[in-house]
């Protein structure tokens, strides 16, 4: 399966639609345009900094890990593993490998992890990767007031 097809298929699972609705692509063409843009960002550290998660054994693209600039010079981590690959520790492995390297290269000293309170899988990944809770309550998430958790990781 090629990269664009894998990204598109992983993006339309129900968990992805619920937790990151702005990262759902209905067509391969949309994915190809997005991938072209993301790849163009690899030469700078302005962001977003998005990298595929590749399964070692099969070389399949099973998801992504990313850092995105948010407000006031802060950065937020994001990650998604395709539904058929979840529950195997891949997100935790990817985040643990990604954060120290990308933050050192980009000169970033802290990263936020923000998710909905009900996204227990994402909260578990952040906890396992050393994030510390700094907020739990109502705030904007995807432009809507929702109950969220904000965690922080420090290099």
Please describe what each predicted stretch is.
Residues 25, 44-47, 111:
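Secondary-structure boundary/capping residues
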Residues 1-18, 50-155:
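Acyl-donor (CoA/ACP) binding surface of acyl/acetyltransferases
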Residues 15-37:
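Conserved GNAT-fold acetyl-CoA-binding loop/helix
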Residues 26-30, 49, 118:
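Short, conserved alpha-helical segments within structured domains
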Residues 37-52:
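A short helix-loop-beta-strand connector motif used in the catalytic cores of GNAT acetyltransferases and
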Residues 27-29, 42, 145:
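A short hydrophobic/aromatic micro-motif that marks alpha-helical segments and, especially, helix-coil
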């Amino acid at each position: 399966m090629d990269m664009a097809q894998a990204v598109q298929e992983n993006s339309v699972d129900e968990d992805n639609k619920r937790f990151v609705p702005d990262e759902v692509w209905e067509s391969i063409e949309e994915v190809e345009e997005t991938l072209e843009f993301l790849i163009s960002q690899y030469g700078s550290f302005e962001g977003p900094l998005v990298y595929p998660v590749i399964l070692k054994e099969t070389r399949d693209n099973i998801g992504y890990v990313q850092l995105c600039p948010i407000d006031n010079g802060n950065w937020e981590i994001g990650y998604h593993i395709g539904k058929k690959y979840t529950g195997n520790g891949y997100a935790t492995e990817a985040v643990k490998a990604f954060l120290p390297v990308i933050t050192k290269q980009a000169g970033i000293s802290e990263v936020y992890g923000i998710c909905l309170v009900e996204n227990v899988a994402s909260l578990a990944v952040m906890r396992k990767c050393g994030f510390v809770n700094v907020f739990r309550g109502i705030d904007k998430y995807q432009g809507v007031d929702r109950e969220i958790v904000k965690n922080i990781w420090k290099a």
